[in-house]
Amino acid sequence: MSDGETAVIQSLAPGPIDGVSYPLKMVYCGQCSMPPEYCDYSGQTDVCRAWATQNAPELLEGLEISDEPAADGDEKKKQKRGGKGSKTGAAAAQAAASGGKKKGGGPQKVTLQREPRGKKSVTVIKGLATFDIDLKVASKLFAQKFACGSSVTGADEIVIQGDVKDDLLDLIPEKWKQVTDEQIDDLGDKKR
């Protein structure tokens, strides 16, 4: 500030302000739980407007809850939870809904493949879900049997840490009778 200017400072005195009734009564939207002046930012403007016209019409007089997109022509985009949906998760839900069978009624086959991961390798099993085998139970069995890590990574895929492909050729038909030796296909090693 320059020497000739003075700032006006209004100090708030402790205690109640004249003309204000206490306790203050705040009204919140019954749909988005925000104050009505912020309903425009909740992403539920049509529902908020319907609630306000039904429950608190006096609030709509001074407010402007817009239904149209912003004035610059850009559409408002609602944020959705969960980010991008994984395709494998959608396929897993579809497989579970259809009883675990693959579409098209193709041949039921279990494939085993060894994949290099750095200096070590993993064994990938695909096709167990076509035989109505619970992948979580199978993964836990493999982890206990081979004393290694095992996880369900896709809709119909189990990854076991280590090269246990030869042992799986014997274990799978022994544990699950519906899978025969002829239905297990050894794909060998995956190239880098």
UniProtKB/Swiss-Prot annotation:
Pfam families on file: DENR_N, SUI1
Domain called SUI1: residue spans: 117-176
Molecular function, one GO term: translation initiation factor activity
GO biological process terms held by the UniProt record: formation of translation preinitiation complex; translation reinitiation
Region: Disordered, residue numbers: 62-116
Low complexity: compositionally biased ranges: 87-99
Family: Belongs to the DENR family.
Record-given protein name: Density-regulated protein homolog
Species in which this protein is naturally found: Caenorhabditis elegans
Lineage: Eukaryota, Metazoa, Ecdysozoa, Nematoda, Chromadorea
